[in-house]
Amino acid sequence: MDASCLFKALLATNWALFLWDQYITFRQYKAHKNAVKRPNEVKELIGEEDYKKARDYKIDNHLFGFFHSWFNQLLLTAQLIGGYYPFLWYATASYPLHVAVFLSINSIIETIIDLPWDLYSTFIIEDAHGFNKQTIGFYFVDKIKKMLVGFALTMPIVYGIEWIIVNGGPYFFVYIWLFVSVVVLLLMTIYPTFIAPLFDKYFPLPDGDLKTKIEQLAASLSYPLTELYVVNGSKRSAHSNAYMYGFWKNKRIVLYDTLLSGAEKEKVHELYVAAGEKIEETENDKKRGMNNDEVVAVLGHELGHWALWHTLINLVITEVNLFFSFAVFGYFYKWEALYQGFGYHDTPPVIGMMLIFQFVLALYNQLASIGMVIHSRSAEFGADEFAANLGHGENLIGALTKLGVDNLSMPINDSLYSWCTHTHPPVVERVAAVRAFQAKNK
């Protein structure tokens, strides 16, 4: 295949995948648009007022998403046809640290182009629906900080990969895979301790009923919990979350303050005020959050992922995917027609990696993503069942219901869209599965 035909074929594939994404997203939009009345099957999960709020939020995000995605797709097409990337690559060729200069300038340009969209999403949509907690000053400081940290982390990795390509011999892709795998594990280890605190303040969860119950849950499962933190997620957004991290005998749990309610939230906020943090809560914010038993049920679900080896399985799947992707890169990275089709007159490895990962592997990435969604949904049901088996079924149902309401999750979904994109099954399906498990084990 000559260079011109190859370029057209890869661009056509890119457009086909984009249109597929637009098709299933439009199906989801129509499902939400047409669901004006609250269906009977979700009435016990969400009230009439909350249902209307969730529907309005989703429709606003859908409409914004359509315009944003079409803008990005048309911009990318114009950049590819117009030769923007080759122009920037060769225009920066005379600078020391060519790759770093190219990637940095491109990243800054992309950030500036996307800035109006991100500002609209944050300060118009999220703000209108009660989620945004950022000031404009905090927003820009946070974005600049993230960009600088991203540069500091990315550039050594890129240069390490480039050095391996040049010096690694015929099996360089194996060494790249090993190098990237080690870097990923290292970042997973150091990120929560050294990088995340650059953006948010983490405090030990105050002593009390919640801490005692979480420690008892961890001990009952022989989970090697060493630290239990709470983070002030409410300074950015009202969305709630919790996660675990760590290796071997050094496991830690982090709760967002938005997950908590009542006295537990008040104790946490007292910590933040004492540390100089500003806490502002609306009446809606005060209504959000879970009771202690529901938080414990959520962590029972998260510990289910650990006990059922889901974390390790996901890591193995990620490693297999990385190895395959780098093997494909190793096979195609000197394919001159690929570079020529996109406007390059030599074969720079960094450009080759960008082209192969974004365009040559595009269809594979789409199929792999759907496969991971299917696997993830199965794991979520398994973790829910694990928590229910511990006796937290009813509290888990309460927690899932509150998570859905607090985050304005729409309980109605298009089946195809959900099957292709929802790594976590809809709340309706999860609640039904927990109840079916409870009925089976009475």
Curated annotation (Swiss-Prot):
Membrane topology field: Multi-pass membrane protein
- Keyword annotations of the record: Endoplasmic reticulum, Hydrolase, Membrane, Metal-binding, Metalloprotease, Protease, Transmembrane, Transmembrane helix, Zinc
The main place the protein resides is endoplasmic reticulum
Please list the residues that bind Zn(2+).
H301, H305, E380
Catalytic site: E302, D384 (proton donor)
Q: Which residues lie on this side of the membrane: Cytoplasmic?
A: 84, 168-170, 333-349
List the InterPro entries hit by this protein, alphabetically.
CAXX_Prtase_1, Peptidase_M48, Peptidase_M48_N
Provide the Gene Ontology terms for cellular component: endoplasmic reticulum membrane; membrane
Please give the family membership noted in the entry: Belongs to the peptidase M48A family.
Role played = Proteolytically removes the C-terminal three residues of farnesylated proteins.
Q: State the name under which the record lists this protein.
A: CAAX prenyl protease 1 homolog
Gene name of the encoded protein: fce-1
